Regions:
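Membrane-embedded alpha-helical bundles of multi-pass enzymes
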Residues: 1-174
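Single conserved hydrophobic/aromatic residue that forms the stacking wall/gate
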Residues: 172-182
């Protein structure tokens, strides 16, 4: 999906840092009216594609430096991306961003950060493709030394959630006003 591509493009070597916000907003929009079961599936596909795109270089390394054949290196890279995508299933557990209050955004952002934390701890501190790592060299640089990458992840996710919620509220208010005027 385009949101997965935007996600990966926000990291080095591309460094289109603003795209992480668009990626998350598009993801939230695509999840908005899904059942929890479908939301978990969609989040899994999103994160699997993010990890496949973001760690595709591992395939080349396994071929060139691990002396593996193409098929085996593709299988190993796919399994790796599959495994590191599993903690993100937690993200599908929220109900709806647009139909809840702004305090609920903190809960949803916390689910994202918990998934990132679990990925980092369960898989030996694997830091690649953590949202906070996409924002070095930005306004968030003052947060890294005191609160760390997970705090940056939280602020980026919360900001994306806030803008998504504000935009959907604005659309619903505009649609309701149009219906009353008709």
């Amino acid at each position: 999906s385009i949101s997965s591509i935007f996600y990966v493009l926000s990291f080095s070597p591309f460094d289109y840092k603003i795209l992480i916000f668009f990626s998350l907003i598009l993801l939230l929009h695509s999840l908005e009216n899904l059942s929890i079961k479908d939301k978990i599936k969609a989040v899994f596909y999103f994160t699997l594609l993010c990890h496949l795109l973001g760690t595709s270089w591992i395939n080349n390394s396994l071929i060139n430096y691990g002396s593996l054949g193409h098929l085996l290196s593709i299988i190993i890279t796919f399994l790796f991306a599959l495994i590191i995508s599993l903690p993100y299933l937690l993200i599908g557990l929220y109900k709806s961003v647009s139909s809840n209050n702004y305090f609920y955004l903190s809960y949803v952002a916390s689910l994202f950060v918990l998934a990132e934390y679990l990925k980092s701890i369960l898989y030996g501190g694997f830091p690649w493709l953590l949202i906070g790592h996409s924002q070095n060299g930005t306004i968030f640089d003052s947060i890294y030394p005191t609160m760390g990458s997970f705090a940056v992840s939280y602020f980026v996710i919360f900001t994306s959630l806030f803008f998504y919620k504000a935009f959907t509220c604005l659309l619903y208010t505009s649609d309701a006003a149009d219906e009353r005027n008709s």
